[in-house]
Amino acid sequence: VTRPIRLACLALALTAAATAQDAAEIALPAPHTTGGKPLLQALRERKSSRAFAPDPLPLATLSDLLWAAAGVNREDGHRTFPTANNKQEIEVYAVLKQGVYLYDPKAHRLTRVAAGDLRAGAGGQDFVAGAPLNLVYVTDYSKTPAESRARWPIFSAAAVGAISQNVYLFCASQGLAAVVRASVNGKALAEPLRLGPDREVVLAQTVGLPAK
């Protein structure tokens, strides 16, 4: 295959990926659930980074990242992170340049909840608005038992901590940059994310290719 043909194929693939990521629903490709760096190496290389290249993540990488963060990893519907009593009350929102999407772990797809570039609203630091992906972690308290709801924030915080570490380890394995952040304005995000009174923003996490 000649170089011009290879370049043309690459351009078509990038165009298709960009078009897919502009859709109201993004059907993610099946995630890779094997391979990557050994766990101990990923732990050794895990770190927080605050300098990101603006390039969008390839759709396959986004798919693998979301599965690693909070995907279904067993036939019984259990996930890659633990929740108290398996309530699975944590929702993951992907804030991309073209819009905000809610991750559906069972169907492994993204559903758009808001169009437009809302990345600047996902955090106060300068790097947030230019990074290709900000993950926002939300607790849906309607899935939790009323009799123990007063104690549930700490349970949800533990679950979100596990998700964020999943993301860190995936990024270490794949050579991506990431940082988890408490600096996220949950009240400002409530409207674009369509969060009702039972939902609360817990943390956010910025992900992307490392700045050159």
Predicted regions located by residue number:
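A glycine-rich helix N-cap at a beta->alpha junction
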Residues: 194-212
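N-terminal amphipathic, basic helical "cap/leader" segment at the start of enzyme domains
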Residues: 21-131
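Small-aliphatic-rich amphipathic alpha-helix that forms the alpha element of a beta-alpha
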Residues: 46, 65, 92, 133-144, ...
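Solvent-exposed coil/turn segments that connect beta secondary-structure elements
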Residues: 70, 97-99, 105-106, 138-142, ...
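Short coil/turn connectors at secondary-structure junctions
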Residues: 129-132, 198-200
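Bacterial N-terminal signal peptides
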Residues: 8-16
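Bacterial N-terminal signal peptides that target proteins for export
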Residues: 1-9
